[in-house]
Regions:
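Buried hydrophobic-core signal for structured, non-transmembrane domains
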Residues: 50, 167-169
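Histidine-centered catalytic/metal-binding microenvironments
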Residues: 1-57, 61-65, 70-96
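Extended, loop-rich substrate-binding clefts of extracytoplasmic carbohydrate-active enzymes
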Residues: 100-165
Length: 169
C-alpha cells in the first residue's frame, strides 16, 4: 500500500480483530515459526499480551510491531521511492536493521539522507537457534562490506517477553 491512510486503517482493523479474538480469556503468549507473509521463508511470529510482532529472515529484522492499545504498526516506515521522495535508498526498513557505515556515510545517515549499501538489510539471515518455549530466536548472516571488501558475520539473539524485545549482538 503506497497510500498511507489505507495502510494505517488496515493495521488498525487487524489489531481491533486481534483484540476481539483475545476477549475469551484463553490467550497464551507465543513465539511461533511459519511462513507468515507468504514469501516462501519462515518468519518468527510473536503474539504477546500487549503487542504483536514478526521477525523476518530477510534483514533479520522486526518487520511488523503493533502495540495493541494503539492499534498501529510502528514499523510502517516504507523505504524512500525516487518518484515520490526525490531520493531512493538501497536498504529495507524495519526495527533492528543492521548497518555498517564509513564515517562519511554515517554523516549522511544522521542527516536522514540515503547512505551506505544496506547489505545486511537485503540479505537472508539464517536461523542459528529457535526456542519456542523460551521465546528466543538467534539469527546470523555473512556478508562482504563493500568499502573495504571485508567479510563480516553478524549474530543476533532476540529475547521476547511480555514487556518487549531485547536484542543481543
Amino acid at each position: 500500500f503506497f497510500n498511507s491512510r489505507y495502510r494505517h486503517q488496515s493495521y488498525k482493523n487487524l489489531m481491533e480483530a486481534e483484540k476481539i479474538l483475545r476477549e475469551d480469556g484463553q490467550f497464551e503468549e507465543s513465539v511461533t515459526c511459519f511462513d507468515y507473509n507468504s514469501d516462501g521463508l519462515k518468519e518468527y511470529v510473536c503474539r504477546m499480551e500487549n503487542y504483536f510482532a514478526y521477525i523476518s529472515l530477510i534483514s533479520g529484522a522486526v518487520q511488523e510491531l503493533e502495540i495493541l492499545k494503539n492499534t498501529g504498526n510502528y514499523c510502517d516506515n516504507p523505504s524512500r521511492v525516487l518518484e515520490y521522495d526525490g531520493s531512493q535508498e538501497d536498504y529495507e526498513r524495519g526495527f533492528f536493521i543492521d548497518h555498517f557505515f564509513t564515517e562519511s556515510q554515517f554523516e549522511k545517515y544522521i542527516k536522514n539522507e540515503p547512505a551506505g549499501d544496506g547489505v545486511f538489510s537485503r540479505i537472508q539471515y539464517e536461523e542459528i537457534k529457535y526456542s519456542q518455549s523460551h521465546h528466543e530466536v538467534t539469527l546470523g548472516a555473512h556478508a562482504v562490506w563493500k568499502p573495504s571488501n571485508q567479510k563480516v558475520f553478524i549474530r543476533k539473539k532476540y529475547i521476547i517477553n511480555s514487556d518487549g524485545m531485547y536484542v543481543q549482538y
